[in-house]
């Protein structure tokens, strides 16, 4: 009986160990194996681990406009308020660690403190057929608002601009997913990731899905003088779209041995991905004020119209023995627009404003230089 118990215990331990090994083998295969590759077009280096050093210059901005009717003494005056977050660029350096398709990056701000970008975090799972890219950053920058009042189409009879003494904070979370149709001959991440090399020029149609969430927080002082309609702003967008991407191979030389050194590959990528924002949720928060402090808040939740937006990028990748150098520029544009009735009874401006229309956009561009070592 003791021998049987010992045998069963040993069998259970070995089975659990085998299942654990089988799980990690599947994970390793998912991260490192590229299936259905046309080797005349795509080459996969043997090294799976990567260590990279990057430098990024980035600018992110927010611009919006609210149009409304202003009632006074029985007359309705047309009004426009505009809000803008400064676009001073931020420079940062960071590290990227990768294994196969998986890449994790983290960067911190350096240089002049014109734009206080506290952090950048990126998590990527990038394959030739499909991939996911998740990025988050926060940035503080100058915040300004303007107001114009006019009678109909006449020139404004009143205009004022306010520049907040303290910066406003923008937080930005973005998750992109893609699928490449011609993934047998086209390696989409070849110009910004070290795991794939494009041997011959090729391109493909792609589909993409994007989730974006952005928050803009104005300081109380800025809010008090920003004409009251929008002190905090949030937008959540889900977009679907597609486009075309192409890798132009400017130079390629296959490795001929372990000791063979030198330039291996130079590839230029161009990508254009127009998208349609199907879900466009907007939330604005307006505080109530008195002479000494602000208290309470009115929140407006609105679903905006479907809107066309755009994601574009270009990148240059250079393979030099075990080193990979990438220069990439990315630009994306997220537009929002909503017409809704402004409930003046619930606002601190007391029955003087209605028919508020809100529109604007978040825009973000970045230029990234990456040096990677494969091992």
Regions found by a protein language model. Name each.
Residues 20-27, 31-48, 182-203, 250-268:
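Short loop/turn motifs that connect adjacent beta-strands in outer-membrane beta-barrel proteins
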Residues 45-51, 91, 100-102, 128-132, ...:
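Outer-envelope beta-barrel architecture signal
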Residues 51-59, 97, 106-110, 125, ...:
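Transmembrane beta-barrel strands of outer-membrane/channel proteins
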Residues 56-69, 73-74, 135-173:
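Outer-membrane beta-barrel translocator/channel fold
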Residues 66, 70-75, 215-322, 331-334:
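Outer-membrane beta-barrel transmembrane domain signature
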Residues 78-81, 107, 118, 158-166, ...:
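Extracellular loop and loop/strand-boundary signature of outer-membrane beta-barrel proteins
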Residues 101-107, 129-134, 183-187, 252-254, ...:
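Repeated loop/turn-to-beta-strand initiation elements of outer-membrane beta-barrel proteins
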Residues 175-177, 361-375:
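Outer-membrane beta-barrel "beta-signal"
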